[in-house]
């Protein structure tokens, strides 16, 4: 009986070693491991015959079986290592770069002056404690006009100023609708800065574009006054231009702020109009459910293109949109 089982072990070892040496993939190698050494594998089937051996024969047969098992495990691990090394070498060969080949030129990109200006503005206001807010560019009449205290007969609704769509909606003419949407969803106090693209039916020339970018800021809290607005604008201008420039506030009119003002900055010997601002009109507060007897707020807005042109001494707004690499490479 022992001789028969030993012959079975020898036959199993020979067939297993032949199969292992001929296997050329890791999945197949794992299947061979299960076939020969698994719980229901061929070695286990042979070992079940040990129960028929005498007490003297079992230790001898058990030792031979362990030798066969260890030999097959060694062969499996050795073959696995060889296959893994071969796979790595094949991958390296496929990914090897010919360093003698001429490289392909990839020109270095640059930040567009409009993007860099917006980023600079947002960095300043985020540093002042403001949260960045955004909204849709296609707006409803309510958010673009009504909620901002702009009545139906206001000039801003004129077809010459606004792009109206067939379904009654429109392309937003300012980023102020973002403020309304934000206030509807948040209770005061709030401080937000809203950048975005806006649209107006302007004739395109050196200083006007039908599509341009705005940034607006809004602060709502108890006890805010015009002095807080002035301090915020002064802090922004100082960081934006790198110095404390002379600033003047001129009385103006905006339907959504009262009082309202235009802000001028003295830059290189000339006064430049840079933004509009004012205290939030009580009607706007009531439109979003805020109590104007409890809360006050201020808002300000400006064109990004104006700041980009001033900071980079650009003489024509159209240069910002014509994708001329000779121009863009300067930044």
Curated annotation (Swiss-Prot):
<keyword id="KW-0460">Magnesium</keyword>
<dbReference type="InterPro" id="IPR006195">
    <property type="entry name" value="aa-tRNA-synth_II"/>
</dbReference>
<dbReference type="GO" id="GO:0006432">
    <property type="term" value="P:phenylalanyl-tRNA aminoacylation"/>
</dbReference>
<keyword id="KW-0648">Protein biosynthesis</keyword>
<keyword id="KW-0479">Metal-binding</keyword>
<feature type="binding site">
    <location>
        <position position="258"/>
    </location>
    <ligand>
        <name>Mg(2+)</name>
    </ligand>
</feature>
<dbReference type="InterPro" id="IPR022911">
    <property type="entry name" value="Phe_tRNA_ligase_alpha1_bac"/>
</dbReference>
<keyword id="KW-0547">Nucleotide-binding</keyword>
<dbReference type="GO" id="GO:0005524">
    <property type="term" value="F:ATP binding"/>
</dbReference>
<keyword id="KW-0436">Ligase</keyword>
<dbReference type="InterPro" id="IPR004188">
    <property type="entry name" value="Phe-tRNA_ligase_II_N"/>
</dbReference>
<dbReference type="InterPro" id="IPR004529">
    <property type="entry name" value="Phe-tRNA-synth_IIc_asu"/>
</dbReference>
<dbReference type="InterPro" id="IPR002319">
    <property type="entry name" value="Phenylalanyl-tRNA_Synthase"/>
</dbReference>
<dbReference type="GO" id="GO:0004826">
    <property type="term" value="F:phenylalanine-tRNA ligase activity"/>
</dbReference>
<dbReference type="GO" id="GO:0005737">
    <property type="term" value="C:cytoplasm"/>
</dbReference>
<comment type="similarity">
    <text>Belongs to the class-II aminoacyl-tRNA synthetase family. Phe-tRNA synthetase alpha subunit type 1 subfamily.</text>
</comment>
<dbReference type="GO" id="GO:0000287">
    <property type="term" value="F:magnesium ion binding"/>
</dbReference>
<keyword id="KW-0067">ATP-binding</keyword>
<keyword id="KW-0030">Aminoacyl-tRNA synthetase</keyword>
<dbReference type="InterPro" id="IPR010978">
    <property type="entry name" value="tRNA-bd_arm"/>
</dbReference>
<dbReference type="GO" id="GO:0000049">
    <property type="term" value="F:tRNA binding"/>
</dbReference>
<dbReference type="Pfam" id="PF01409">
    <property type="entry name" value="tRNA-synt_2d"/>
</dbReference>
<protein>
    <recommendedName>
        <fullName>Phenylalanine--tRNA ligase alpha subunit</fullName>
        <ecNumber>6.1.1.20</ecNumber>
    </recommendedName>
</protein>
<comment type="subunit">
    <text>Tetramer of two alpha and two beta subunits.</text>
</comment>
<keyword id="KW-0963">Cytoplasm</keyword>
<dbReference type="Pfam" id="PF02912">
    <property type="entry name" value="Phe_tRNA-synt_N"/>
</dbReference>
<dbReference type="InterPro" id="IPR045864">
    <property type="entry name" value="aa-tRNA-synth_II/BPL/LPL"/>
</dbReference>
